Amino acid sequence: MGCKGWWLLGVFAFLAASSDGATLAGQSVVPGGKTEIRFAVPKYFQDLAAQAGNPRPDTGRAVLFFPSGFDPGRTTPILIVTSTSDFNRTSLMDAEWYRAPGTAEGWIVLGTDATISPRIDSTQWRLAMLGAALETIRKDWPQSARWPVAFAGFSGGSKRSGMLGVMLAKSGSVRVGGFFLSGINEDRLSESYRAYQPGRGLLEVPVWLSSGSRDTVATPVAHNLVKASLDRTGFKRVRLEQFDGGHQLKMSEVRRALQWFRQLGRF
């Protein structure tokens, strides 16, 4: 075969590889890259979001950061990021913080929201958007329903992360592989566990508490109290780690936590 023939074969191979690239909700997925999607919100999620007088969101949006080498045919854990309600933060904004440590450890990092603002930024609103996003992902990648998920949040987002994780665990729709709770000063995870009773299996899920030694908002004492509360509830794998810093998210702590979740969950 001449040089021209080999060149044509190379072109055809490139085109075939390009056409087989993964997509999600009509958007291209690039390993190691970022994908933003929009999705329809089913009526039952609209009903949930509209509680407390909120508007009915018919369209949601999500940002996903993918690890290098991502292949939807292989199991890839998902790190679900939830932001605080303070300072008009959204989970899409906070997801960017977790991008580098999350993807470096081989995780997808996910943040979700609606395309409109709620009257009250309720947990039901957050749950509805997250649920609709996960449903959209599973529509294109059915196998993702079996992928482990972990919940991560900082400050007020850490409280919300625990609540959302328990609510989804109760539904039986996710395989919970960990909680990363940073800058937390109140144990909403135990409170939600008692309220929703998702089953004792959740008590085996690892919980990483990340505390800044000079944090004046969620003090080291507050973190110790949260750990003691989780221990009393019966959570068996609670780890409190302190770093030199204030009320902040420590990237190296995120990586260590994700490694620990994988080690214990064997995924």
Residue spans for each PLM region:
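Bacterial N-terminal signal peptides
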Residues: 8-16
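Gly/Ser-rich "nucleophile elbow"/oxyanion-hole loop immediately N-terminal to the catalytic nucleophile
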Residues: 68-75, 120-156, 169-170
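Active-site machinery of serine-nucleophile hydrolases
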Residues: 78, 84-133
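Cell-envelope and extracellular/periplasmic
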Residues: 82-86, 138, 154, 161, ...
